[in-house]
Each structure stands twice: as C-alpha cells, then as structure tokens.
Amino acid sequence: MNIAEFHQNIEQVWQKIEEELENQGADVDCETQGSVFTITFDNRTQIVINKQEPLLELWIASKLGGFHFAFKNGDWVSNDGQRFWDCFVEACAAHGENVQF
C-alpha cells in the first residue's frame, strides 16, 4: 500500500465510524484534527484513533489500552491477529456505548 492508499483507507475507517455511531444513536462527539480522530463520550472519556504514516499503521487508545493495526488482506489487524473493528466495539463498550460494526 502506498501513502495515498493508506490515507484513503484511514479516511474510510473514520467516516464509517462517524456514520455508524450516528446511525446507532451513540451519544458521542467525533472530531478530526490532522492525523488524529477523537471520539468523546457522554461521560467525557475518549477513544483516540490516529494515523501512523511512517509505519502505515492505525493506532487506537482507549480505556482498554493502546493497540496498533496494519492493513493485511483487506482488513486492519493487530500483530496478535485482533481485528480493528472488534477492538473498537470492545473499546466503545468500555466507554459506555454498545455499538456494532
């Protein structure tokens, strides 16, 4: 994957998150600043998702900790094989919002 494809893939992830959270009625605010996408929950906790361009990775930080994902076979996957979307759903639940992706 080249840099342009990387950014396009990340933008698609961020757009899907924002659209699905809105469609599912989640009480959150989403904000993008440069390479950082922040989701603030009603209880004022946050999930931060950011682009790591030099590594071509997607990173997520939440109450559950920090996780790194690389794009493999059409999906964002961590070194231990966890899918980004599964991690994101678990993180949202830890922050008080039950969502499905």
UniProtKB/Swiss-Prot annotation:
GO terms for molecular function: ferric iron binding; ferrous iron binding. GO terms for biological process: iron-sulfur cluster assembly. PROSITE patterns: FRATAXIN_1, FRATAXIN_2. InterPro entries: CyaY, Frataxin/CyaY, Frataxin/CyaY_sf, Frataxin_CS. Keywords: Iron, Metal-binding. Gene3D superfamilies: Frataxin/CyaY (3.30.920.10). GO terms for cellular component: cytosol. The keyword Iron applies. Belongs to the frataxin family. Involved in iron-sulfur (Fe-S) cluster assembly. May act as a regulator of Fe-S biogenesis. This is Iron-sulfur cluster assembly protein CyaY. It comes from Haemophilus influenzae (strain ATCC 51907 / DSM 11121 / KW20 / Rd).
